[in-house]
Amino acid sequence: MGNSAKKFPPIQGGALILLTLALSLATFMQVLDSTIANVAIPTIAGDLGASFSQGTWVITSFGVANAISIPITGWLAKRFGEVRLFLVSTFLFVVSSWLCGIADSLEALIIFRVIQGAVAGPVIPLSQSLLLNNYPPEKRGMALAFWSMTIVVAPIFGPILGGWISDNIHWGWIFFINVPIGLSVVLISWKILGSRESEIVHQPIDKVGLVLLVLGVGCLQLMLDQGREQDWFNSNEIIILAVVAVVCLIALVIWELTDDNPVVDISLFHSRNFSVGCLCTSLAFLIYLGSVVLIPLLLQQVFHYTATWAGLAASPVGLFPILLSPIIGRFGYKIDMRILVTISFIVYAITFYWRAVTFEPSMTFVDVALPQLVQGLAVSCFFMPLTTITLSGLPAHKMASASSLFNFLRTLAGSVGTSLTTFMWYNREAVHHTQLTEHINPYNPISQSFYHQMNQFGLSDTQTSAYLAQQITSQGFIIGANEIFWLSAMGFLGLLIVIWFAKPPFGTQH
């Protein structure tokens, strides 16, 4: 039996700075890897002789394995120790990244991505719990702010970096960049934390719970990733996945409430702040990550931006978190955490409303970048206060389980958000396309006048119809995006009420 991490004195000085950097880099690396491959799928699929739809399994395979492994992190950490599990997971992440980079077939790449996703699961929750358990109580806010910044900034830089790599060098470097970063994280963490292992508990594994978890979460993630490709519930495959996911997840909750050694600690929801924090974080991340995917898609499909320029237009959101996170971490505890979250949700609502009324066919790069820049204020006040509220009052020995469940729900919400947003966007485009097309008929003098003008410019009626169809599609996508932005603004205003159900005091001193 090892010692509980709680018994070790806090780390101080240069070692503390190095540890913070290493754990934050581990988080950044893992979150970056979940988005960096998205824009490179056409390049990867073409290079490996596969279709685009087959290439999407490069994303799906990682997402499914990752979603399954995150919630069992708490049990694994108790069984093998938090430090040991973190070091092994990070090292295996490095190895699997290298294997992904040298893969010479799509099948091999998918297998290595499954391994990569599975070993990546424990990295984020353990980096969070190790940071909190080894920091001086008075400095935990700053540590959490710096760590949180990587969670919300990494998805922005993933498409930029992935686009640049796929455009300029071999796509394998999307994965190779993890190797030096990951090895540095392992060496620094081992040097500082090697003798600070958490308590090891030899408890039996909950086999039934594990099977239900794998089936439920795996089917749910597959459904979310493949839904649009398979036309959602018009596909028997998607219906079967949905039924299996719902049945298994309901059975999982019932089973875990009665099992003595649950693989997922449902009892954490007895904590009011944990429940409120998970709900607010999950719903907010669902909306936020949906926009992270939607805005580059809109810019590429309608405004013909390259992947790199679409990423650059979205990137200003990272400026304020980089500048303000240390300040909020240093002074945030002087005010009610709920106030910081309220400010965040209000700014989120304002920026989504801003997009809803300004996104139009003639908008410029600045029109996209400016709301992104202001939204950075919301991001700065978002993750650190919500994480603090969620974990407040929990004992140290439950921190790994709480962090893994919290991050699992956040990750799952992000998957739901991206799938739901893209589904709504394409669906609303189809609706608006039909509505707008109805106005193009022989009885509408405006449309007939337009055809006449185009004839004078030398275009035939067929060419004019093709041009109008293209314009209607673009308008449909823009209107659909604006409707989603409106709905997102309303969602954040609704969350303003929920966050005030959290109960002070807040803090990570346990």
Curated annotation (Swiss-Prot):
The keyword Transmembrane applies. Residues 1-7, 53-56, 113, 166-168, 225-237, 300-308, 360-375, 505-510 are cytoplasmic. It is found in: Cell inner membrane. The chain crosses the membrane at residues 8-28, 32-52, 57-77, 92-112, 114-134, 145-165, 169-189, 204-224, 238-258, 279-299, 309-329, 339-359, 376-396, 484-504. Its main location: membrane. One of its GO terms (biological process) is transmembrane transport. It is a multi-pass membrane protein. Keywords: Antibiotic resistance, Cell inner membrane, Cell membrane, Membrane, Transmembrane, Transmembrane helix, Transport. GO terms for molecular function: transmembrane transporter activity. Residues 29-31, 78-91, 135-144, 190-203, 259-278, 330-338, 397-483 are periplasmic. GO terms for cellular component: plasma membrane. Confers resistance to antibiotics. Belongs to the major facilitator superfamily. EmrB family. PANTHER family: MAJOR FACILITATOR SUPERFAMILY MULTIDRUG TRANSPORTER MFSC. This is Multidrug export protein EmrB. It comes from Haemophilus influenzae (strain ATCC 51907 / DSM 11121 / KW20 / Rd).
